[in-house]
Amino acid sequence: MHRDLHMMSDRSEDDGDTSILTATKPKTKRPPLYKVLLLNDDFTPMEFVVHVLERFFGLNHAQAFEIMLTVHKKGVAVVGVFSHEIAETKVAQVMDFARRHQHPLQCTMEKEE
C-alpha cells in the first residue's frame, strides 16, 4: 500500500491533465444604501426647512429651496442616499435640530431597493 501512494506522487507533470487553476476573487457585496426622506407638516416654516437642507445636507440655497417645494407640494422628498450609518446620523441631526427649535419636522430613512 505504501508503494502505491509513493508511485502516485511521482507522476510526471505531463500526464494529460488539462485542468486549469484560476484564482477567483470572492465577490464583495456592496452595503445597502438608505434614502433620507423629509416629510411635510403644516407647522414647520419653509425657511427653516431650507436652512436644515443647507446645514445638514450641504445643499446650496437653490437646491434646498427646490427640495423644500417638493416636500411642500408632494408631502415627501428624498433628500439624499447614504450608507446606513450616515443616513441614521443625518436623520438624528435633523430631528434633534427641529426639536430644539420647537418644530415638528419629520425626517426618516428607508432602505433603497
Curated annotation (Swiss-Prot):
<dbReference type="InterPro" id="IPR003769">
    <property type="entry name" value="ClpS_core"/>
</dbReference>
<dbReference type="GO" id="GO:0030163">
    <property type="term" value="P:protein catabolic process"/>
</dbReference>
<comment type="function">
    <text>Involved in the modulation of the specificity of the ClpAP-mediated ATP-dependent protein degradation.</text>
</comment>
<dbReference type="InterPro" id="IPR022935">
    <property type="entry name" value="ClpS"/>
</dbReference>
<feature type="compositionally biased region" description="Basic and acidic residues">
    <location>
        <begin position="1"/>
        <end position="11"/>
    </location>
</feature>
<comment type="subunit">
    <text>Binds to the N-terminal domain of the chaperone ClpA.</text>
</comment>
<protein>
    <recommendedName>
        <fullName>ATP-dependent Clp protease adapter protein ClpS</fullName>
    </recommendedName>
</protein>
<feature type="region of interest" description="Disordered">
    <location>
        <begin position="1"/>
        <end position="25"/>
    </location>
</feature>
<dbReference type="Pfam" id="PF02617">
    <property type="entry name" value="ClpS"/>
</dbReference>
<dbReference type="GO" id="GO:0006508">
    <property type="term" value="P:proteolysis"/>
</dbReference>
<comment type="similarity">
    <text>Belongs to the ClpS family.</text>
</comment>
<dbReference type="InterPro" id="IPR014719">
    <property type="entry name" value="Ribosomal_bL12_C/ClpS-like"/>
</dbReference>
